[in-house]
Amino acid sequence: KEGYLVSKSTGCKYECLKLGDNDYCLRECKQQYGKSSGGYCYAFACWCTHLYEQAVVWPLPNKTCN
């Protein structure tokens, strides 16, 4: 599974500016989803890879980013 890293409190994606390999996204994905996950910046938001099936990713039901 893969998807955009999301803030559970706001429903917002984690923004990033440096597209492609991105240390910030990699660090945040690993922190939220575990050491086996990966991450990079895609369309100015952190995209996480190698997630477990139950991982919560954007969009969150009933939570819009505002």
Curated annotation (Swiss-Prot):
Variant or mutagenesis effect after changing residue 66 to H: Non-amidated peptide that is less potent than the native peptide
Domain of life: Eukaryota
Keyword Secreted: yes
Subcellular location: Secreted
Disulphide bridges, residue numbers: 12-65, 16-41, 25-46, 29-48
Residues recorded with modification Asparagine amide: 66
Effect of residue 66 to S: Non-amidated peptide that is almost inactive
Processing after translation: C-terminal amidation increases its affinity for sodium channels.
Tissue localization of expression: Expressed by the venom gland.
SUPFAM superfamilies associated with the record: Scorpion toxin-like
Domain LCN-type CS-alpha/beta: 1-66
GO cellular component: extracellular space
GO molecular function per UniProt: sodium channel inhibitor activity; toxin activity
Any GO BP: defense response
UniProt keyword list: Amidation, Disulfide bond, Ion channel impairing toxin, Neurotoxin, Secreted, Toxin, Voltage-gated sodium channel impairing toxin
Function: Beta toxin that binds site-4 of sodium channels (Nav) and reduces peak current (observed on Nav1.6/SCN8A (IC(50)=307 nM)), shifts the voltage of activation toward more negative potentials (observed on Nav1.6, Nav1.1 (weak), Nav1.2 (weak), and Nav1.7 (weak)), and induces resurgent currents at negative voltages following brief and strong depolarizations (observed on Nav1.6, Nav1.1 (weak), and Nav1.7 (weak)). A reduction of peak current of Nav1.5/SCN7A has been observed in another study (IC(50)=35-40 nM). This toxin is only active on mammals. It has been shown to bind phospholipids.
Note: Is the most abundant and deadly toxin from the venom of C.s.suffusus. Negative results: does not show inhibition of peak current on Nav1.1, Nav1.2, Nav1.3, Nav1.4, Nav1.5 and Nav1.7 (at 280 nM).
Swiss-Prot/TrEMBL domain comment: Has the structural arrangement of an alpha-helix connected to antiparallel beta-sheets by disulfide bonds (CS-alpha/beta).
Similarity comment: family membership: Belongs to the long (4 C-C) scorpion toxin superfamily. Sodium channel inhibitor family. Beta subfamily.
UniProt-recorded name of the protein: Beta-mammal toxin Css2
Organism: Centruroides suffusus (Durango bark scorpion)
